[in-house]
């Protein structure tokens, strides 16, 4: 996840260890703030574009669909650094948890699904709404969830005992769940 190396905090660490050899590896070479990896690292040793990784079998083909929710208007939210502010987005999306849950359950069917929410409160309201639309096991976790509990939830998901895994910013990087076949970005 070397794309984080361009952050102010990481730059201080790299400057402190100025003579150290640093190898950076990331699947996210472009940052929303426009800072390129070439500003942190001397050279790119290897680049493997998505267009090559898919046919080579390293990435699955994906299908992206959008399902507008009646009455939901995101235009009232102002973007910061290219993204909608999580707090305002989470608050707004929590109001639409029920219709969103209906869409997720309808579209996911019986597929193992990971749901990404904007905030902790949003994740918990979305999980509660999902439970009203499905008899399948739905679990939610956030940064405040005990690590052992999170580990157990993930193990249960990978074993097929949890159908929907709802989270707020914890399974975004370095997370591997090959059985997941549906992702909902809410």
Predicted feature residues:
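Conserved helicase ATPase core of P-loop NTP-dependent helicases/translocases
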Residues: 114, 123-172
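SF2 helicase motor core recognition
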Residues: 57, 165-183
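Conserved interdomain linker/interface between the two RecA-like ATPase lobes of SF2 helicase motors
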Residues: 44-117
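Short, high-confidence coil segments that cap the C-terminus of an alpha-helix
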Residues: 19, 109-110, 161-162
